Amino acid sequence: MTNSFQNSRRDLRERAFQALFNIEMGAELLAASQFAYGYDKVTGEDAQVLELPIFLLSLVMGVNNHKEELDNLISTHLKKGWSLERLTLTDKTLLRLGLFEIKYFDETPDRVALNEIIEVAKKYSDETSAKFINGLLSQYVSEAPSANKS
């Protein structure tokens, strides 16, 4: 499958989401990342293992390593009566991924990271969830003391 979209940052964010979702289902981090990156690229029995892009690994490992902190941040921005446990796994994973990129990737402007995760949300969730994710992450961006507003 030849596709100029593959390996774009948007594509890699989507693959990071897929890997993180699989990790939540019990998959090992590296195996989940390799599968998410290569499932549509590797064919045949003698296919070589693909080198994972740094951006993809940074997202997956970063979210995995900061999961508790990210969950606490998400919880503090939920409306009264809501808890992390009430969120779907899809929405939780998208929020963690978006929040991680906003918080830790200085080279990505906050609004770009926000818009990109909304596009992934529209693909893997519904419009209501995309609006919810937009609202929560927008609130975080507007309140963050050193927000990268570019």
Swiss-Prot record:
PANTHER family: ANTITERMINATION NUSB DOMAIN-CONTAINING PROTEIN, N UTILIZATION SUBSTANCE PROTEIN B-RELATED. Keywords: RNA-binding, Transcription, Transcription antitermination, Transcription regulation. The keyword Transcription applies. The lineage of its organism: Bacteria, Bacillati, Bacillota, Bacilli, Lactobacillales. Involved in transcription antitermination. Required for transcription of ribosomal RNA (rRNA) genes. Binds specifically to the boxA antiterminator sequence of the ribosomal RNA (rrn) operons. GO terms for biological process: DNA-templated transcription termination; transcription antitermination. One of its GO terms (molecular function) is RNA binding. Pfam families: NusB. Belongs to the NusB family. One of its GO terms (cellular component) is cytosol. It comes from Streptococcus pyogenes serotype M4 (strain MGAS10750). This is Transcription antitermination protein NusB. The keyword RNA-binding applies. Coiled coil: none annotated.
